[in-house]
């Protein structure tokens, strides 16, 4: 990680993963616990020339590192095609820390952030 304000994800320590994942966040009703599920389609960490073992997903930013060891490969026709990682938190403080990382990661990757309330989107068309 070259820049202190940059947030990155690594599967191999010291090697930033350039593929931007799809991320879904879920929380318990009381807000204390939850998960973020990351899906990386065709990540460079799965490239045939990479010989290192993936031992976890490492999320690094100016505050330090968040780690999950829950990383699974998805295979299509016997070939690795995606990585799915699940980061779990067990307190409001852990959730807030994760969200600070997520905002920095979105900013570093040029992404937007949207919050789905679970409600159906409003329609622009009239019923008539």
UniProtKB/Swiss-Prot annotation:
Among InterPro entries, the record links this protein to: Psb28_c1_sf, PSII_Psb28_class-1
Please report a single Pfam family linked to this protein: Psb28
GO process annotations (BP): photosynthesis
The compartments listed are:
Cellular thylakoid membrane
Q: Which UniProt keywords apply?
A: Membrane, Photosynthesis, Photosystem II, Thylakoid
Disordered: region residues: 109-128
Q: Which residues cross the membrane?
A: none
- What would be one Gene Ontology cellular-component term for the protein? photosystem II oxygen evolving complex
Where do Polar residues bias regions lie? 111-128
Query: How does the entry describe its membrane topology?
Result: Peripheral membrane protein
Assembly and partners are described as: Part of the photosystem II complex.
Q: Which family does it belong to?
A: Belongs to the Psb28 family.
Q: Which PANTHER family match?
A: PHOTOSYSTEM II REACTION CENTER PSB28 PROTEIN, CHLOROPLASTIC (PTHR34963:SF2), PTHR34963
- How is this protein named in the record? Photosystem II reaction center Psb28 protein
Encoding gene, per UniProt annotation: psb28
